[in-house]
């Protein structure tokens, strides 16, 4: 008999060799009926998996993300099966589940049309109705290669696997696919599927490889859940920063400028400027000193920092090492420059902590397939910073960084949209990371202890660290469900040594400082994108590029309108007036479409009484208010950063 510890902490005994499904069934017929997959000792597994020793076990239903993933992964195979039925010459690539659905990549001479997607969806429903059996099996490498010999992408994937790795397949009726799983036991409970769209995608995400056709879809157990999801997708389209940001004239792009190089228009630039001034003032209030460093440096600097060895492919290099005496590169990070500033003078323990901040323009050579609007770009502006601390100061300063970030998030109204990810190294990936296992383990243990002391609720992620140390990533989902890193805090164990940074301790001895890397508000472009989507372009008044719009009823009242503009502008309000000879109703509608927080209509009565007729986003038509009273209210709303 083996002991199985269930999610609720209870321990049950079972015969060795029972499957996860059989264990679920022994607990409850209903649980087995609703089960999609299991988690054994923290690892997601198939319900078919046999349990042969003492384990901890969770049974996952569709209510869990693991359960949703198993259902949608299974349906991605149904899509591939349908493609092979209708377009048998198509070659198969990969088909994983993703946050809100699944995709499958195909190599087809002619891309799938909208009509093709309709046919495929109908064929998928037909397959689900047939409810073919789902079987998992394993093969040795030579037999696996023989089975997949007509599928070049599958052959490549098999060859990529390590010699000792298990090569598993799933058979769905007459269709077989290379797959590690997990998959559901039966398609019968899946009542609602939808193919969303198709797009281009490079094989393995590498633009040097062939462009494939990716079909996105989703699946639910109930039609009502699918309908709710599709409604959310439509709302997301309306909020998409790529669409809304252009409509509101916040940013634009141009093919002659280049991909991943957005141009902030005056309104977008005003929002970023407002954020930047606020962040820099807040950092200085908390003891930061601001620096201004070059946009490029000689390769020598990046060789010291390790960027040249571990990050060169992500940098824009100016010159040829073989031909030029000096080779420069645009900076991907600010850290080497601020460390050079630190080393410009000797420091005592009394000088520490030193908190450097900088609004940094950075450059990263992202692949074309990765770039998206303001989220993923090649040039961006980062609220960068590095804290040089003693070992005794590390936890308190880390806490101070988090308090700053949490204050900024709460003020922006995005604190509830954030999740925390503790990003660790992969000891097998020595090309990506500095190869010092002892230092990695020590630093990761230190960060974990700090996070636990601060009661941060986080998940751990392997192979997501910076090359020089572990980090805490603050993740935010965009309207399409994709998770992006908005803020990051890192503990650096390597670069203080590489730059020979030191301080003199109280005993007069030279010591290495610890370094905390952090971005207080992250990349301004990405934060702007998140805020566009969060507020659907209707930013809080303090952040709105135009806070007030004055609309004279006719040109007879232009002089009074201009006096209102001057009065408020002199007090720092961002204000415009619309003097066009258009009907007032038209001008009001247009100002509303621009998401202007306050619209002030002025005519004969308002001019005579020094008033303004106020229309606000919150209260609509508020009637006539004395200009002084409105000014006081507006300035208070801006000063308190009311949302």
UniProtKB/Swiss-Prot annotation:
Cofactor, how bound (note): Binds 1 zinc ion per subunit.
Where can this protein be found?
Cytoplasm
Tell me which UniProt keywords the record has, alphabetically: Aminoacyl-tRNA synthetase, ATP-binding, Cytoplasm, Ligase, Metal-binding, Nucleotide-binding, Protein biosynthesis, RNA-binding, tRNA-binding, Zinc
According to UniProt, the reaction catalysed is: tRNA(Thr) + L-threonine + ATP = L-threonyl-tRNA(Thr) + AMP + diphosphate + H(+)
Can you give the residue ranges of the TGS domain?
1-61
Q: Which cofactor does it need?
A: Zn(2+)
Q: Output the PROSITE patterns linked to this UniProt entry.
A: AA_TRNA_LIGASE_II, TGS
Recorded hits in HAMAP family, A to Z, give: Thr_tRNA_synth
Q: Which NCBIfam families match?
A: thrS
Q: Give the matching PANTHER family.
A: THREONINE--TRNA LIGASE 1, THREONINE-TRNA LIGASE
Protein name in UniProt: Threonine--tRNA ligase
């Amino acid at each position: 008999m083996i002991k199985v510890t269930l999610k609720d902490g209870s321990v049950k005994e079972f015969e060795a060799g029972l499957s996860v499904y059989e264990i679920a069934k022994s607990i409850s017929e209903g649980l087995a009926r609703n089960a999609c997959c299991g988690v054994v000792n923290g690892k997601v597994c198939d319900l078919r998996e046999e349990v042969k020793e003492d384990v901890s076990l969770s049974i996952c239903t569709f209510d869990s993300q693991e359960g949703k993933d198993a259902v949608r992964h299974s349906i991605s195979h149904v899509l591939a099966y349908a493609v092979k039925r209708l377009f048998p010459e198509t070659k198969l690539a990969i088909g994983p589940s993703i946050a809100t659905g699944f995709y499958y990549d195909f190599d087809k001479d002619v891309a799938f049309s909208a009509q093709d997607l309709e046919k495929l969806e109908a064929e998928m429903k037909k397959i689900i109705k047939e409810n073919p059996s789902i079987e998992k099996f394993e093969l040795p490498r030579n037999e696996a290669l023989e089975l997949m010999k007509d599928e070049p992408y599958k052959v490549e994937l098999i060859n990529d696997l390590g010699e000792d790795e298990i090569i598993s397949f799933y058979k769905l009726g007459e269709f077989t696919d290379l797959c590690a799983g997990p998959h559901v036991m039966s398609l019968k409970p899946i009542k609602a599927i939808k193919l969303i769209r198709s797009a281009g995608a490079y094989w393995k995400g590498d633009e040097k490889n062939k462009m494939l056709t990716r079909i996105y879809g989703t699946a639910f157990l109930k039609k009502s859940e699918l309908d709710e999801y599709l409604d959310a997708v439509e709302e997301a389209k309306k909020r998409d920063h790529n669409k809304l940001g252009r409509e509101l004239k916040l940013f634009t792009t141009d093919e002659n400028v280049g991909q991943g190089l957005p141009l902030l228009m005056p309104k977008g630039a005003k929002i970023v400027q407002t954020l930047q001034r606020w962040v820099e003032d807040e950092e200085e209030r908390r003891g930061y000193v601001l620096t201004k460093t070059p946009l490029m440096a000689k390769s020598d600097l990046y060789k010291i920092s390790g960027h040249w060895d571990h990050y060169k492919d992500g940098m824009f290099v100016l010159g040829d090492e073989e031909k030029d005496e000096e080779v420069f590169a645009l900076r991907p990070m600010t850290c080497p420059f601020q460390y050079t500033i630190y080393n410009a003078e000797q420091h005592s323990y009394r000088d520490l902590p030193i908190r450097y901040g900088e609004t940094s323009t950075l450059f990263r050579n992202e692949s074309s397939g990765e770039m998206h609007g303001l989220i993923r770009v090649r040039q961006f502006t980062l609220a960068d910073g590095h804290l040089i601390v003693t070992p005794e100061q590390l936890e308190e300063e880390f806490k101070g960084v988090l308090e700053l970030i949490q204050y900024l998030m709460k003020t922006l109204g995005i604190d509830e949209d954030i999740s925390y990810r503790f990003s660790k190294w992969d000891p097998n990936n020595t090309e990506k990371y500095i190869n010092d296992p002892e230092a990695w383990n020590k630093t990761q243990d230190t960060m974990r202890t700090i996070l636990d002391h601060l009661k941060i609720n986080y998940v751990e992620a392997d192979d997501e660290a910076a090359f020089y140390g572990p980090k805490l990533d603050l993740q935010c989902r965009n309207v399409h469900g994709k998770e992006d890193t908005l803020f990051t805090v890192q503990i650096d164990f390597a670069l203080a040594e590489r730059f020979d940074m030191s301080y003199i301790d109280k005993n007069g001895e030279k010591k290495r400082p610890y370094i905390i890397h952090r971005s207080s508000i992250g990349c301004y472009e990405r934060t702007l994108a998140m805020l566009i989507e969060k507020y659907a372009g209707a930013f809080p008044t303090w952040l709105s590029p135009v806070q007030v719009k004055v609309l004279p009823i006719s040109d007879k009242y232009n002089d009074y309108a201009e006096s209102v503009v001057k009065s408020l502008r002199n007090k720092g309000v961002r204000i415009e007036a619309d003097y066009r000879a258009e009907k007032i109703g038209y001008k009001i509608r247009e100002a509303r479409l621009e998401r202007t927080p306050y619209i002030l209509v002025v005519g004969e009565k308002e001019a005579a009484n020094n008033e303004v007729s106020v229309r606000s986003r919150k209260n609509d038509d508020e009637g006539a208010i004395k200009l002084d009273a409105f000014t006081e209210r507006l300035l208070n709303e801006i000063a308190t950063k009311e949302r």
